[in-house]
Every structure is written in structure tokens, then in C-alpha cells.
Amino acid sequence: MVFIESTAFTRRLRELADENAEDVLNAIQDDLLANPQRGSIVQGLGGIRKARTGDPVRGKGKRGGLRYWYLYLERRHHIHLLILLNKDEQEDLSYRERATLRQMVAELKRI
């Protein structure tokens, strides 16, 4: 499996997880390797899934921790990590973020 991080995902990972960024990324990757379809599909986003992971900086488990959105392209064995958010800051995507993700998915599926 190949993991591909968007610039936005990587930036937020560093901001939110600080020196624990590698641990958070490993936890996400381990979860997705075990089950690439683990997250729930977000309606209207072309197959993007939303899942949870813990937040070691704030001492939160999966329920109160971080949310991430990803696209699993099964044929290519690629997982695109797209967005990472702190649940306390923002639990779901804005209209603008959803529109941007729809465009990203269209491009990724074309390649």
C-alpha cells in the first residue's frame, strides 16, 4: 500500500501533533493497512472516507481526538491522506473544503 499525503494534511499533522506527528501518522497508517475501508463514506465526495484517530497531545482517544479524510484507490493500492482536523476545532468539513475535495478526487481518479 502506498500512502500519499496532501500538503494540507502534512501541515496540519505537524501543527496538531507536534513532536508526536510520526506516532499519529503511524497510527493512521496501521489502521488503514488493517482495513483500508474503515472510515465511513462521506456523501457527495466521490468515495472519500472519514475516520478517527487519537490525539496524544491533548490526551484524547479516537472519539474526542483527530478526524481525517482520505481516498482509497483500491486498483492502484493508494491511500491519499487529504485533511486532518482536531474535533474540538472543527468536526466536519465546510462547504468550501467539500468543493475543493470534490475537485481533488476528480483529478486523482483521472491520473
Predicted feature residues:
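Short, hydrophobic/aromatic-rich beta-strand segments within well-structured domains
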Residues: 65-84
